Amino acid sequence: MKWFNTLSHNRWLEQETDRIFNFGKNAVVPTGFGWLGNKGQIKEEMGTHLWITARMLHVYSVAASMGRPGAYDLVDHGIKAMNGALRDKKYGGWYACVNDQGVVDASKQGYQHFFALLGAASAVTTGHPEARKLLDYTIEVIEKYFWSEEEQMCLESWDEAFSQTEDYRGGNANMHAVEAFLIVYDVTHDKKWLDRALRIASVIIHDVARNGDYRVNEHFDSQWNPIRDYNKDNPAHRFRAYGGTPGHWIEWGRLMLHLHAALEARFETPPAWLLEDAKGLFHATIRDAWAPDGADGFVYSVDWDGKPIVRERVRWPIVEAMGTAYALYTLTDDSQYEEWYQKWWDYCIKYLMDYENGSWWQELDADNKVTTKVWDGKQDIYHLLHCLVIPRLPLAPGLAPAVAAGLLDINAK
C-alpha cells in the first residue's frame, strides 16, 4: 500500500494542514503570537515568547505561499511583532518573553534567536516588503553574538546586554541553528550557511553521537565535552532534558537529509555520512524510544543505556519521525520507511489528533491518556508542518522556499 507521493494522500494532508492553520490563527495577540491552550484559547499567564512568535511567522509564511486567505496578514503581524515589543531597541536582539506590561524575560537565548532567523528567512519567500530588512538584521545579530568563529559552532545564550554568556553549549539550539541556516542559504545563496550547518552536524552527530550508539548528547561545556549528568535532578525539562531526547535524534536525521539534498542541488557530492548517520539516528530512535514499555508512542527521554526516563509521549517526536521517514524514503526508496510512516499516522489519528477542541494534544502519559507533565496546552503549530507539508515536497530547497517556488506535489501522481 503506497501513500508517499500519491495525490489522494496529499489531499488528506492538505485538509489536515488547513485545520491546523485555522487553529493557529487563535494565537494572535498585540505583542506577537501567544501560547495556545488546549481549546485554542490564549494562556495569558504564559506571556508572548520569541520562539513561538518566530515559529508562527514561519508557519504563516508557508500558509501565505500556499494561497491561504488571511495568511499574509499574519505574516505582516509577525514581522511587526518582531520589530515591536519583543525587540530590544537598546542592546539589540530580542527578549525571550514579554507581555502587555513589558519585559518578562530579558535574556537573549540562542534557541529563540535561531527561530527568529527561521521566521525572517521564511517571511522573505512571501515577498513582504519588510522581510528582507528583518532577515538582514537577524543575520547581523546571529553573526555578532551567536555564531562563534573560534569554535565554529553556536553559543547558547547571553544576558540582556550581551555582556555575559553561559559556559554551556546546547545541542538543541545548535540543531535549530542548522534548520535556520538551511533556509537562510535558500534565500541568500550564501554557501557559508551550508558549511556552518555541515560543521555543526559533524560535531554533534558524526563525531559524538555516532560513537555512542547514536544517542545524541544534548549538553556540552564550552570546550564541547559532553555533560552526561546535566539536569539529572530535573529530567523532564522542556528544553534541556536529562539524558537523551530521542525526538531530537530523529529530527536531526531529517535536517541532515535536507543538507544532503542542498549539497546535491549544487552539484556537490555530499559526505556519505550524512545519509548513513541519518539512518542510524532513525533506527536508534525506534530502538530506544518506540513503545519500550509495551504501549505505542515515543517516550520523551532515555538514559545512556537507552532505558526510559520520562515516559510521557509528547507530540513533536512522532511528528518529526514522520518527516524523517519521508526524507529517508525519498533518498533510499526503501519501503520500511513508508511502513513506519503509515504506522505512526495510525497512532496519531487514534491518540493525538483532537477533532473536538482543535489541533493535536501536546502530551500523553504512558497509557496514551492526555496529561501535562512536560507541556501545558498546545503552544503553537510549527512542528506539525513537518508531517503535513514536508511529505509533499522535494528535500531541497527547504520548506518555505520550496512552497513559494510552487513545488508542492511536484512528484505526486
From Swiss-Prot:
Coiled coil: none
Similarity annotation: Belongs to the N-acylglucosamine 2-epimerase family.
SUPFAM superfamilies: Six-hairpin glycosidases (SSF48208)
Oligomeric and partner information: Homohexamer.
Originating organism: Salmonella typhimurium (strain LT2 / SGSC1412 / ATCC 700720)
InterPro entries cross-referenced by the UniProt entry: 6-hairpin_glycosidase_sf, 6hp_glycosidase-like_sf, AGE/CE, AGE_dom, SQ_isomerase
Function: Catalyzes the isomerization of sulfoquinovose (SQ) to 6-deoxy-6-sulfo-D-fructose (SF). Can also catalyze the interconversion of SQ and sulforhamnose (SR). In vitro, can also catalyze the interconversion of mannose, fructose and glucose, but has extremely low activity with glucose.
Binding, 6-sulfo-beta-D-quinovose: 55, 111, 172, 176, 238, 251, 362, 379, 383
Catalytic residues of the enzyme: 248 (proton donor/acceptor), 383 (proton donor/acceptor)
Entry keywords, A to Z: Carbohydrate metabolism, Isomerase
UniProt name for this protein: Sulfoquinovose isomerase
Keyword Isomerase: yes
Keyword Nucleotide-binding: no
Catalyzed reactions per annotation: 6-sulfo-beta-D-quinovose = 6-deoxy-6-sulfo-D-fructose; 6-sulfo-beta-D-quinovose = 6-sulfo-D-rhamnose
One of the record's GO molecular function terms: sulfoquinovose isomerase activity
A GO biological-process term: 6-sulfoquinovose(1-) catabolic process to glycerone phosphate and 3-sulfolactaldehyde
Enzyme Commission number(s) from the entry: 5.3.1.31
